[in-house]
Regions:
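Short, solvent-exposed loop/turn segments enriched in Ser/Thr/Gly
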Residues: 37-50, 101-108, 158-164
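Surface-exposed binding patches on compact interaction domains or structured appendages
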Residues: 1-27, 117-144
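C-terminal soluble interaction/assembly domains
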Residues: 108-114, 122-126, 131-168, 176, ...
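Short acidic/proline- and small/hydrophobic-mixed sequence motifs that coincide with surface turns
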Residues: 1-4, 58-60, 116-121, 160, ...
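Extracellular/luminal low-complexity segments enriched in Ser/Thr/Pro
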Residues: 31-41, 150-157
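Short, acidic/polar linear motifs in exposed loop/turn regions
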Residues: 1, 38, 55, 114-117, ...
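Short strand-edge motifs at loop-to-beta-strand transitions and within beta-strands
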Residues: 26-32, 94, 144-150
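Long, low-complexity ectodomains and other extracytoplasmic segments of secretory-pathway proteins
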Residues: 54-110, 114-115, 172-187
């Protein structure tokens, strides 16, 4: 007989197995319930839980759970949408041409809140640890302009590179903006 349990389960996940104990040849199910209100995060998330068999850790037994947390704007009235924040970027792509290995490429992305309510930056996520980006401010008033510097560390990479930054806000028409830094890294 086999009983599964999980370690490192975050507070926003509820994991259950059915049946609780598997008999030889029997099938079971793992149920995962995700509560985004408890996650305090936005955008793509991944959690890797270790599976224990009969209370013991087993090498390479990982259970991955992914989710994409987005704001629900479906209840907004037409008036609320008309008065909502609106993010407008000067540029969403920066082509740095060529850069040498083990250097830094930086670019300042500029944007404006063209809406009538405060624009809130929920999260900025890069697709590679080699790229960093931090906003100057997380609340942009109506009509206000702001910017942030994105830095790509070329490291030992070579060839064509394309790094993405996901800019997540409370703009109901464009809650996630994908920004790109691209170019060729040479020796």
């Amino acid at each position: 007989m086999m009983r599964l349990s999980f370690t490192s389960v975050p507070k926003y996940l509820d994991i259950k197995t059915k049946p609780k104990v598997l008999k030889p040849g029997e099938e079971g199910h793992i149920w995962a319930k995700f509560d985004p209100r408890k996650a305090d995060d936005w955008g793509f998330m991944i959690d890797r839980l270790k599976i224990q068999v009969n209370g013991k850790n087993v090498n390479r037994n990982l259970f991955s759970i992914t989710a994409k947390i987005v704001e629900d704007f479906s209840d907004l009235s037409p008036e609320e949408r008309a008065n909502a924040p609106k993010v407008k970027f000067e540029n969403t792509t920066y082509d740095f041409g060529t850069a040498k290995q083990h250097t830094k490429v930086s670019y300042t992305f500029k944007f404006k809140n063209e809406g009538k309510r405060d624009l809130k930056i929920r999260k900025m996520r890069t697709t590679c640890g080699c790229t960093t980006a931090e906003p100057e401010s997380t609340v942009i008033l109506p009509g206000e302009e702001s910017s942030f510097k994105a830095i790509f560390h070329t490291g030992g990479r070579s060839g064509y590179q394309r790094k993405l930054i996901y800019f997540i806000t409370n703009d109901p028409e464009r809650s996630t903006v994908r920004l790109t830094i691209k170019g060729k890294v040479i020796k």
